[in-house]
């Protein structure tokens, strides 16, 4: 029984009243313990593979180039931000959002992102976030917190640094891209930091991404 890693105290207890039923129960209890360990280790393995996949995406990022791709509809766990609250209160909202994401030991698909007004962005203004978003875990996130990002064409760019320091530059770049390709923005701006303080202590080494849904002007 020790070869099955059954504790000595349980073996001693069994030997005091040994019979077929007790032996079967001893094995069933050990089986249950093994299955629980396998499940826990599988979760850890899934998290490791998710992080490695994310790191690989960062490694192969093409920076400074706007791409236009079709994306399917996607669910996001969304926490809205009141437009009238202060900067300190925004930090509190972000903390509450993070609590939702991490409360069940769920690894995020990507870092927590935020949504900015397209009107502010195209004026070169880094405004307050309208909401924070994360990829949800459908097993426990309440449905009322889930928002669908529509399918469609998305213009996306990855760049080194943080948006706060490059807002005007990126605004001009997107404006030129939309005009050149006869496109118009139809949604607000999705912002995420792919490489952050967990991977570097220099914000100039951060890798960020912004994207927005667009439509062709020729459809009108």
Whereabouts are the PLM-identified features?
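Hydrophobic alpha-helix position signal
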Residues: 1, 101-102, 178
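Short, positively charged
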Residues: 1-13
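Short, charged amphipathic alpha-helical surface segments
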Residues: 12-67
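Non-membrane alpha-helical structural segments and their capping/turn regions in soluble enzymes
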Residues: 24, 88-91, 168
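Alpha-helix N-cap/loop-to-helix initiation residues
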Residues: 41, 86-87, 163-167
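Mid-protein regulatory/catalytic core that forms ligand/cofactor-binding pockets
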Residues: 53-157
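C-terminal regulatory/effector modules of DNA-binding transcriptional regulators
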Residues: 112-220
């Amino acid at each position: 029984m020790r070869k099955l890693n059954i504790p000595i105290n349980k073996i001693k207890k069994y030997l005091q009243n040994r019979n077929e039923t007790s032996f079967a129960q001893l094995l069933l209890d050990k089986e249950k313990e093994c299955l629980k360990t396998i499940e826990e280790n599988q979760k850890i393995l899934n998290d490791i593979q998710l992080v490695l996949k994310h790191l690989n995406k960062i490694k192969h990022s093409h920076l400074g180039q706007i791409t236009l791709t079709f994306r399917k509809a996607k669910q996001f766990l969304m926490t809205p931000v009141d437009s009238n609250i202060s900067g300190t209160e925004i930090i509190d909202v972000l903390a509450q959002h993070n609590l939702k994401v991490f409360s069940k030991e769920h690894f995020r698909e990507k870092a927590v992102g935020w949504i900015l007004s397209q009107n502010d962005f195209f004026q070169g203004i880094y405004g307050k976030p309208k909401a924070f978003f994360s990829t949800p875990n459908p097993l426990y996130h309440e449905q009322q917190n889930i928002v669908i990002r529509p399918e469609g064409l998305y213009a996306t760019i990855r760049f080194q640094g943080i948006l706060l320091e490059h807002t005007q530059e990126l605004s001009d770049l997107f404006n030129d891209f939309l005009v050149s390709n006869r496109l118009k923005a139809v949604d607000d701006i999705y912002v995420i930091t792919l490489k952050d303080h967990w991977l570097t202590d220099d914000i100039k080494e951060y890798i960020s991404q912004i994207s927005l849904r667009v439509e062709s002007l020729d459809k009108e």
